[in-house]
Amino acid sequence: RDVERSRGLGDVYKRQNYNSAVATFCNNIANDLPIQVNDPSVELELLYIDDLVDEMIHALKGEEHHCEFEGLDVQPKADGRYCYCPVTHKVTLGEIVGLLHQFAEMPKTLMIPEIPADSFAKRLYSTFLSYLPKEKAIFDLKMNVDQRGSFTELVHTLNCGQVSINISKPGVTKGEHWHNTKWEQFIVVSGHGLIQLRKEGTDEVLNYEVSGEKIQSVIMLPGYTHNIINLSDTEELVTVMYCNEIFNPNKPDTYFDKVEK
């Protein structure tokens, strides 16, 4: 009853090109090396090392899970002869490779993959990163620079928009536009600035003075033209900007109109 039968163990310690397809794929894709997949439809049942360790800790506490086996199939049974880990993941070789290519493209696409809590993707991403060569742990971001400062997209998400960082030079005003559906949040993290909003068709201007000394978030409301002004004569204004959608040049939903006429 103290024997634990382990499934294919996926973790950061397996040897690539030796005893694990997952380790081999992670290593080769992380290092831009070729891989070979003879049959993408082949399904593996994988057990992540942390889940195995958690189950072993449960066993030490007398809280192990018991089972019997019918061939290779686990049959949970309270008085079973074997201990087993109930958390495993059935996934095809094609699915594994597809996810790994998404992970590898992230520095180019900025797209954060969907990695729900307790998902196989979350475990695979951590495993993939453990094979990343040290020179790939840092990568450049595309800075859009002009005389006013810079704007740099940091991350994209599939369903929750994007995060960027905006740097404004002293005295500079940026924005002066509004959106129908798109909305944003501006968070000044360094410097001293003024964020202004005005609802289209009205004259009232909302003024929000913000500073890196007190981190606050200001929502750019749909239908409100808005700007951000660096009030300093000497310091740059650094603002983290969240937008609920990724910018689409074919459907920008951006209309220019000064806040103060």
Where are the model-predicted features located?
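Single conserved hydrophobic/aromatic residue that forms the stacking wall/gate
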Residues: 2-9, 13
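A conserved pocket-lining segment of Rossmann-fold NAD(P)-dependent short-chain dehydrogenase/reductase
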Residues: 24-47, 67, 75-85
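Mid/C-terminal beta-alpha module of Rossmann-like enzyme folds, strongest
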Residues: 51, 58-142
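A short glycine-rich, His/Asp/Glu-containing loop-to-beta-strand
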Residues: 135-176
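Short beta-strand His + acidic residue motifs that chelate non-heme Fe in jelly-roll/DSBH
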Residues: 151, 175-177, 195-197, 217-220, ...
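Glycine- and acidic-residue-biased ligand/ion/polar-headgroup-sensing regions
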Residues: 181-200
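Short acidic-glycine-tyrosine-enriched beta hairpin
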Residues: 200-222
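Double-stranded beta-helix
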Residues: 201-204, 229-261
